[in-house]
């Protein structure tokens, strides 16, 4: 699993269980939006028999979404999750918390399922979190590059990253 440094990483830090070393990758602290998809593609090429997943937010995935075309062109069956909260969630929360206002963090996201299909990848939208498992089973069985969009309204499970511990 490759995680972009977005809101989903806060949730995964709290709830994701890693059972094997070197199976969860996060460029934490570097602000490298767009990291997950190209990294996952490279890992899938290196380990073709292991499912590889990229976890992105809707804003961060726009930095490297074109790499999905590369996965299609070379038949690299990577799984791309896009958690769509219509913006830069980490920065949104940071601005709300520190300044009480927002600037440049709310965006209008494209139709990610349609975009994936336009690249020749498989695309599915999951509007009910109880259906995520079904979507994962579906994309694992078709063995082609796939995008799973999950519309959401994330709230951070914890806010330690922005707490001023000196107070």
Walk through the language-model features, giving the residues of each.
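Thiamine diphosphate
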Residues: 11-167
